[in-house]
Amino acid sequence: MTRSSRFLGTASPPPPEEILAAETDMVVILSALLCALVCVAGLAAVARCAWLRRLTGVNPAAVGEAPPPNKGLKKKALQALPKSTYTASASTAAAADDLPCSSVGDGDSSTECAICITEFSEGEEIRILPLCSHAFHVACIDKWLTSRSSCPSCRRILVPVKCDRCGHHASTAETQVKDQPPHHQHPSQFTSAIIPAFLP
């Protein structure tokens, strides 16, 4: 055999063990750095959530104490709401005198139901909501109030919420706040309409 054929026939020499050891060390180091990067990113996300929660003032213990959702009225409460017969003469007389009409809503849309958007007919039975005096067809407002407890026009809650501490109803709170001096008011009597929310 010739010298050149001897070199071609032999396999390449195995790499030295130092090169293999350096490659495995590099893989271990890179995987450790990747794990550390994932851990730092997770901690940063948790810290950011905690910081935002503290800035917005959300207390995890108070989350369970949120007010109940706006559910509908019970049949007994629904039947207790006043009904009236619509008369066009009463609504036009009240509009001419600029007086609040007891048989219809707030003057600008007093001749139509805000739910079905049809005008009231003479002699038609309407239901008047007690807190805001908005008027609606009985069938329309009854269907609305079985799933929600607020006025469709002004979104005012119709169910009075009673304070556990003093027994006052939130529906009468606005009139009491205006009449009482500030040092006699109970904190449950304040509403968001009276006191603006604090914005940082």
UniProtKB/Swiss-Prot annotation:
Gene3D superfamilies: Zinc/RING finger domain, C3HC4 (zinc finger) (3.30.40.10)
Pathway participation: Protein modification; protein ubiquitination
EC number from the UniProt entry: 2.3.2.27
Predominant location: membrane
Protein localization: Membrane
Family to which the UniProt record says this protein belongs: Belongs to the RING-type zinc finger family. ATL subfamily.
Protein name (record): Probable E3 ubiquitin-protein ligase ATL45
Species for this entry: Arabidopsis thaliana (Mouse-ear cress)
